[in-house]
Amino acid sequence: HSEKTPRAGAFSGYLNKEKETEEAWKNGWFHTGDTVTMDETGMLYFVDRAKNIIRRAGENIAAAEVENCLFEIEFVSKIACIAVKDDIREEEVMACVVLEDGKKESKEVAEILFNHALEKMAYFKAPGYILFMDDLPVTGTQKVVKHKIFEPEIDPRNLTGVFNFTHLKKRKPND
């Protein structure tokens, strides 16, 4: 490989995004930003984008895993799980939820979501905060654009209507 074609077969950079290109290419290798696991046979499995991994008290939580769990509930229309600041545990999971038409936002509905996650996943993965929203920003292909949900200067934990479940996140005997 020459300097002009590092690791042939990969692309040379992002269009008009010099900083992002520089961050992605390190030591001649392209870093995709994906997080994967490998099983004992060498098979790779996609977990999530690294930027969507929530770091809580030393645990890595894939936002996609929490989203998939909460999507099992029939009245969830759209969902995005994001990291919010936590003074003790570094980050905490916040679920931003759009309900199906006709389903009303309430503490009881938030409790259903939280308890479902708590039952299906390790306690630390359950959303510590739940916020119901009218809609979520999406791309033309309907993928949620997480960085556009809140303005950077906003702390979503302090918004009106946020349900705080952090005090209920306790280790279960099997965790």
Where are these regions (language model features)?
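A general structural signal for short secondary-structure boundary/capping elements
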Residues: 143-144, 175
